[in-house]
């Protein structure tokens, strides 16, 4: 919503002053701080459900007012929590129709990069995020085409089975995808400076056309733009990462998305059993932390024993 100063746990005061100065000639009857909500860290009390809110959510009257609320989070905060990527030198990748990677930093970046967004963990620590508009949308469209083909022969393929079968088939493909290249841009992509998307599939005349290479090329494409942004962090900014955890729909088929991401990042990747639930799992943990945390217990300490025992799948490098 607005840059956070991790040292104070509040909005960046210097940037707020700059904003107010830039709009001073507009005659607005407010200062920016007056219209922004209060910043809350994970574990703090965010209020309770009102009678009006309870009626809005449940007209039957079963839902009662007074339910305590934790500070809300978007996909970024819930993704970090779901994968326990809230400590320095940890990170996570959320991959579905869009994809983003978030790395918890040890120190601020040395320069401004348009490909990188600065956010925070739910506890307020600085995080560098690479967000790409395009991930699996093009891939999903092709899987839909294969489902339509099967229906022509009277076969009603189970959606989950269809995805897992095609994803696993991709692992049989050549490492260079047999000379095939997929461009998965359904929409514009700020990371590469494109305002509109045009999905494309290209191959050389001597390419090895086959289902395995076709699927592998589209899985590679789903993470290719993410790699451009991550290379800025890893190579230009020399950001250090001890662990990366994947979650989201791309990782539902065991081992496949995990292997592709490991190749893209040149780093070991872990995936949790709750990979497909990502955000919902994360906000549930944040609510539990609000309810059950002990005095002085950090979010990271709370997540260690409570939430992740036996949940991490084997790591793939």
Task: Give the predicted meaning of each segment.
Residues 2-33, 40-245, 250-311, 317:
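Active-site core segments that coordinate phosphate-bearing ligands/cofactors
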């Amino acid at each position: 919503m607005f840059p956070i100063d991790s040292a104070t746990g509040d909005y960046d005061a210097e940037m707020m002053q700059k904003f107010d100065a830039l709009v001073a000639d507009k005659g607005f009857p407010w200062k920016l701080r007056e219209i922004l909500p209060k910043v809350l860290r994970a574990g703090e009390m965010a209020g309770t459900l009102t009678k009006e809110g309870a009626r809005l959510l449940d007209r039957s009257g079963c839902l009662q007012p007074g339910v305590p609320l934790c500070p809300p989070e978007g996909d970024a905060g819930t993704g970090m929590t779901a994968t326990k990527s809230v400590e320095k030198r940890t990170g996570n990748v959320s991959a579905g129709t869009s994809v983003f990677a978030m790395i918890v930093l040890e120190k601020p970046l040395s320069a401004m990069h348009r490909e990188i967004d600065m956010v925070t963990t739910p506890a307020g620590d600085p995080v560098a995020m690479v967000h790409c508009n395009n991930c699996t949308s093009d891939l999903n469209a092709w899987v839909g085409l294969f489902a339509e083909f099967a229906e022509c022969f009277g076969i009603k393929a189970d959606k989950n089975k269809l995805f897992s079968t095609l994803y696993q088939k991709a692992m049989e493909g050549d490492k260079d995808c047999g000379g095939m290249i997929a461009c998965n841009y359904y929409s514009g992509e700020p990371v590469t400076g494109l305002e509109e998307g045009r999905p494309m599939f290209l191959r050389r005349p001597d390419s090895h056309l086959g289902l395995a290479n076709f699927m592998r090329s589209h899985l590679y494409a789903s993470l290719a733009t993410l790699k451009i942004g991550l290379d800025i962090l890893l190579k230009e900014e020399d950001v250090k990462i001890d662990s990366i955890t994947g979650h989201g729909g791309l990782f539902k088929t065991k081992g496949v998305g995990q292997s592709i991401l490991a190749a893209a990042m040149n780093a070991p990747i872990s995936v949790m059993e709750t990979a497909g639930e990502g955000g919902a799992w994360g906000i549930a943990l944040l609510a539990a932390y609000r309810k059950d945390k002990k005095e002085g217990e950090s979010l990271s300490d709370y997540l260690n024993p409570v939430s992740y025992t036996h949940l991490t799948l084997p790591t793939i490098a």
